[in-house]
Structures are given as C-alpha cells and as structure tokens.
Amino acid sequence: MSMSYRALKFRRHAPTSTQHHPKEDMNFHQQPPGLPGPALGQTMSPPPWQMGESNPDFLPNNFNQLNLDPQQPEADGGQQRSKGSENNLYRKYEEKVRPCIDLIDSLRALGVEQDLALPAIAVIGDQSSGKSSVLEALSGVALPRGSGIITRCPLVLKLTKRECEWTGKITYRNVTQQLHNPSEVEREIRRAQNIIAGNGVGISHELINLEVTSPEVPDLTLIDLPGITRVAVENQPQDIGLQIKALIKTYIQRQETINLVVVPCNVDIATTEALSMAQEVDPDGDRTIGILTKPDLVDKGTEKGVLKVMQNLTYHLKKGYMIVKCRGQQDITNKLSLAEATRKEVMFFQTHPYFRVLLDEGKATVPLLAERLTTELIWHINKSLPLLENQIKEKHQRATEELQQYGDDIPSNEGDKMFFLIEKIKLFNEDIEKLIEGEEIVIETESRLCNRIREEFTRWVLILTTNIEKVKSILNEEVSKYETKYRGKELLGFVNYKTFETVVKHYLGQLIDPALKMLQKAMEIIWQTFKDTAKKHFAEFCNLHQTVQNKIEDIKTKQMAEAANLIQLQFRMEKLVFCQDQIYGVVLNKVREEIFNSVGKASENPQSKHPFLNNQSSVSSIVEIGVHLNAYFTETSKRLANQIPFIIQYFMLQENGDKVQKAMMQLLQETQHYSWLLQEQSDTATKRKFLKEKIFRLTQAQQALYEFPHFKSI
C-alpha cells in the first residue's frame, strides 16, 4: 500500500470539524487523479484531457493512481472485488505510465541530456523555502539539511514505485553506490557533493543521480536545484548568488522542463526570487507550478491572502498552485516519521477553517501533489516524444558528419601505420588528380579550379584585344615618329620595315608584365586550392600537415620560376617578328580589304577624321604600315592567347600537381618518421572519442525510442 494511499485512507477515519462541510469526503473517480478542478476565479493549464477531452491513450478511462473510494466495502466479497479492481488499475498503471518515465530516465542515464533537453520537472526555491521538506515527503528519504547552501549539485531524484523492499542507488562520475537503508541517503549525498564541488560551499553543474525504489513512493523523476541565495556568507564566493542563478537558469529555461517553484506561505509571493526567475523564462506560466509550503506558519488574519494565491488571483500561473504541509524542524528533532507526517498533514487541512476547501478541491497534501506531478510529467513526456525523436536524428547525423572529418583512430602497430598513411596519401592524391582533370566535386556556390583559372585566361584575351586597339588608335602618331627617325633613302609612300618592326617589338614588350601577373594570379589560385586540399586530409596531423604544406610551397616556387622563365622566353622569341607566309598572307589580305574599304568611305567625306587621312602626304605609307601592323598583331594575339595559358597550365597545374603527388609517395619511404608524421593535434583524439561516445548514446537513444511500446501510437 503506497504512502499516499494510507495517508488519504487515514483521512476517512480522522475526526472532523464541528463545522458542516457536506462534501468533505472526496470521490476521486469524478475526474482524473491529481487534476483538481479550478477554484473560484482560478484558471489552470492542466494537460488537455483536463479541459473536457478524453483521457490520453496512456491512461485508462477509470485510472486513478491512488484509487480511493470513500465508501467502505460492507462485506468480504466487496473487499475482494475492491482489491481486484485496485490490482487491475495498478496493472494498467504499470503498463501505461511507468514505461514513459523509464524511457526518459534511460535516456538520461545514457547521457543524452548532454546533447539535448529531456522532459523533466525541476524544483527551485529560495533558501529556507521548504524545498527539501517537499522532496523528502515525496521521496520518503531524508535529504541534507542545514543553514547556507545545502544542495550544491543538481540532484536527479528518480522515484520508482514497486512492491519490493526499499532499495536505493546513488551515481556520480564513475561512482555507483548501492544503498540498503533510507538513513544512508543524506550521508552519501553529502559525500558526493564534497567529491564533486569540493569541501566547503562551492557549487557544480555536475549531476548526482539518486534512485529510490519502494512501494511507498510515487513514480516520478525530479531534478533538485540549489536554493537561491542573495548574500554570500562565510567562505562563499562573492558571486555565489549569480553562480546559482546561472545553474538554475540552464534547467528552467528549457521548454522541455516543468518548473516546480516552492514558496513559503508566510512570505510575500511577489518578492520571491524563485518565482521571479520562473516568470523570466516562462512569462505566461505555461510550464510553471507553484507549491506553497509552511501553511501552519501563516499569521492569523493572512489566511485569505494565501487562498487568493491558491485561487490564482495574486500571481497567475496557468498550471496553478498546490499547497503542502511537511515536517518542521521540531518534527525532525522529535524523529517524526514521514508516514506520520503525512497523516498529520491530512489532519491539518481537514480541520483548518480556511484551508480545508483546498483539500476538497484536490489542491492540498503531498500525496495529491505526487499524483499531480506524475500526471503532468507523463503528459509532458508524450507531448515531447515526436520532437525528441527528430532532435536525436538530427544531432546523430551532424555528429556522424563531424566525426568523418576527424577520420579513424591512429593504429599503434608500425605496419598498420604504413597502411594507414598509404590510405591517407592515396585519398589526397586522388583529390589532386581530380583538380588537375577538372573533375572535383564542388558545392553550388563554388567553381572548379580549372574554371577559376580559365577566368584569368579570359582576362588575358581582353588584355591582348586592348593592346591591338591601342596600336590602332595611335598608329598615325607612332608611324610619323618612326618615319622621321628611321626613314632612309626610300621615296615617300614606301613602307619602312624598320618602322614596322620597331612598333611591333614595342607593343609586344608591353604584354610581358600582364602575362607574368596572370601567372602570379593563377599560381595563387592553384596553390591555395592545393593547400586547402592538404588541410582537408591532414589538418589533424600537425607534423604531416606541415610537411605536406612545405612540399607544396617548395614545388610551387620551382614551378613558378620555370613558368616565368618560359613566358619571358616566349616574348623574347616574339621579338623575331615571324609568321608563316601562307598564314600571314591570308590575314594580310583580309585586313587590307577591311581597312581600304574603311579608308575609301572616309575619303568621300571631307569632314572625316580617319587617322589615316590626317596627313595626306604620308597617307599611303601610313595605310600600308597600318595594314601590316593590324594583320601581324591579329595573328600574334591568337598565338599568345593560347601559348601563355598553355605554359601556365602545364607548369602550374599539370606538372605541379604531378610533382606534389610524387612527393607524397616519397613520404612512404621515410618509415622511421611514421609515428612523427601521424602525431595528432592534442585535442583531435579527444574530439574523436567525444563524437564516438555521442553517436553511441544517440544511437542507443534512437533504439530506445524505437522499442518504446507506445511511441507509434502517440
């Protein structure tokens, strides 16, 4: 028989007040358990089935965790039927409710909470709010008490209702301690906090897990957080208040968390820090439940103020409030048992002239609080499962992709290291080869290496075209200057070959710098791409990565010098002014036809400013030399438009890539350096281990969700 069952069964035999209350006995079959109807003026936000909807799939229609009927059976047969009904409901409860809580507890045990938020109930309160007393009443075990900060680490309190002997287990870091008696709990929690947070008054974000299995506890999992303090005392850090608030906020700000805010009845609720923090992260109170404690300490005449709070008229929370009376310090001194304290609690509310109505409404006593919290948690879990599945799937995929970037673990055997290095170099060389052939895979916003180089070659063609147009635009001036300087005994109108040759050499010489700049630009593009490829494959191996970068740099420098020399050689050869007769003749005739047609039309127009007509005395000479210059530059530009890119592609891409691949293969001959080359960065192995552990627990979580019997029906 559960503690809550015995407590409320006791109520049926407790003495009643002399005042008349016709509906003092409760019939819990009138509505689902722990889901009290709102008092006058109170608006609550219970799970959906409380608002006129049918019970959810995970609760039977006649389900009641406490299963209380105020009418006593009149005969043994009635008792047997009642007991059979109770066992049947309990079996349905075990089938429908327990798996939900076990699922989330198993995910939490796997460490999934490191990766995403799980549905939970977080308990917060100011110091001396009665938070520990509430948790003690729910769990049936004594928790650390005293002045100052008592809860110094988040405590996950997992309560499991089972018909067996009391058992407990505390887990933290690599420690798992079995507990055989409730009296051991307080001592072991203090020991765990000292190990984690140190002896003293410091706090830690590290979790302590306490599991309690007993027939006297509800099925519930809570997270107890440190009490909120405003002023540092004794040896506490001056910012201890900020530290505690930051810790609490990490839990209560999660949308998956139900915030259980514990507030004493004998304080102004508007001044409580805990409720203020809850409102900050949950302004509408959608996931906040208020718990009022210490109703026996309320000053006479202020009871109505407490009732207004309970009726949601003072500080509105959609989920409303519950009120409990737990053991006080005198009760603890007198060693009052928790079971007896529960009976006294029921008696207190039954006989209280103001608060008895709260008992009638199902908003008072620890057993009803336990029932309410269990129902809220189950509903919250079922609501969160589809989103939880998607989050686990997404994080598993991202972790898997990230792990691929770190590669496999480094083998310890020297022979295995060679094969490991061979595989690494093979993959790198394959990517270099794809770059050379223009077959690498790129994302939509990027462009292949060959295409980026081709863009530079396109600019080179524009430079050559601009050079031809420049020659045309200043032809009259240039030819006149060279005619004056180099003309010999030939008559007016005869072409001076020296003039033609000088103009050609001068303007071809102006193309050397643009060609070398194009080489430099193409080299930078190729060099950066090779470096990025090396980083992709070897970034986690600091020595190997640096070695490869050095080889890429050395080879690039040599190839750059060879390509530059060949480009300069090309322009030195261009000074020979040569073109095959059959090729030049065709181009010359075509250009002559175009130019003379243009000049003929211009001569018919007296106002024409054609450059060839500005000096009539030398028109024939200028026109003729212009024809030859135009023809020669047209053909030379075609030659240079291809030849310079050929040189760059061969030396800086093809041969450069081949030499890099060969240099990588030569690394395999340095067997004595394998260990040095494969030395990872300090945090790489740690990251790989972390990601593997993350993937493992997320895989386990996916499996747990898949095996959850109710998941497909949610």
Swiss-Prot record:
Residues 61-70, 79-88 have a biased composition (Polar residues). Gene3D superfamilies: Dynamin, middle domain, P-loop containing nucleotide triphosphate hydrolases. Residues 224-227 are annotated as: G3 motif. GO terms for cellular component: cytoplasm; microtubule; nucleus; plasma membrane; presynapse. This is Interferon-induced GTP-binding protein Mx2. Residues 622-713 form the GED domain. Induction: By type I and type III interferons. Coiled coil: none annotated. Its main location: cytoplasm. It comes from Ovis aries (Sheep). Residues 293-296 are annotated as: G4 motif. GO terms for biological process: defense response to virus; innate immune response; receptor internalization; synaptic vesicle budding from presynaptic endocytic zone membrane. The lineage of its organism: Eukaryota, Metazoa, Chordata, Craniata, Vertebrata.
